[in-house]
Amino acid sequence: MQTSFVALLAVAASLASALPHGGNSYEASLPEPTNLPEPTKLPEPVEGPYKPKPPILPEPIKDNYKPKTPILPEHVEGPYKPKLPEPTTGDPKNNTLPVPTCVDGKIKTHKVKSGESLTTIAEKYDTGICNIAKLNNLADPNFVDLNQDLQIPTDACEKDNTSCIKPDGTATCVKDGKKDGKDIYSVVSGDTLTSIAQALQITLQSLKDANPGVVPEHLNVGQKLNVPVC
């Protein structure tokens, strides 16, 4: 019996030596304490009922307040004229606009037909009577021959209808009693009473008076007309 008790004491001693810290197994298994954060302080309670702050209102308008009158542009009488930009300074050559150029048309050949005159031919080719007369060296633009070939400067930039035309006559009769040795005029192709009167340097009315019954719009080639002489 004594031997069993001694054996138990020996086992207990061996177990105690195997444990840390003198055999206190409970203390060895606990973790070390950690630092906890301090609790936040709550705001102190407000004594009495809650009173919100009053809103900030704009200042009241004074009794003598007068709003500013807007400044309007002065009324301009008459039509509206927009302001144009002033011309730039510097070299005047840089301020000039390009001048459009005009180029005359080609020269075409035209054979004179019955009833045509330089006036009708010039209108057909958009040119001037004197442009045609000068190119063809015509002494009198009022006279062209039937089937005559004319060089026509078409689409003339500067149409000349006056420099080669004789002024209207002011006399009522042909002096010396004759015109080229005759007092009878024979109508040629392209003639009109006006062109004949200009060639004779007499008024159109005096030529009409000398040829009663003649229709100016229907002259025939070879028709004889009386020339008033004095």
Swiss-Prot record:
Bias (Basic and acidic residues): 74-84
Residues spanning the signal sequence: 1-18
Region span, 5 X 4 AA repeats of L-P-E-P: 30-87
Name of the molecule in the record: Intracellular hyphae protein 1
Sequence-type repeats, residues: 30-33, 36-39, 42-45, 46-49, 50-53, 57-60, 65-68, 76-79, 80-83, 84-87
Residues carrying covalently attached carbohydrate according to the record: 94, 161
Tissue expression as described in the entry: Expressed in penetration hyphae, infection vesicles and primary hyphae (intracellular hyphae).
Entries under InterPro entries matching the protein: LysM_dom (IPR018392), LysM_dom_sf (IPR036779)
Function: May have roles in host-pathogen interaction, including establishment and maintenance of biotrophy, prevention of host recognition of the fungus and a barrier to host defense molecules.
Pfam families per record: LysM
Keyword Protein biosynthesis assigned: no
Gene3D superfamilies xrefs: LysM domain
Organism: Colletotrichum lindemuthianum
Lineage start: Eukaryota, Fungi, Dikarya, Ascomycota, Pezizomycotina
Main localization, broad class: secreted
Keyword tags: Cell wall, Glycoprotein, Repeat, Secreted, Signal
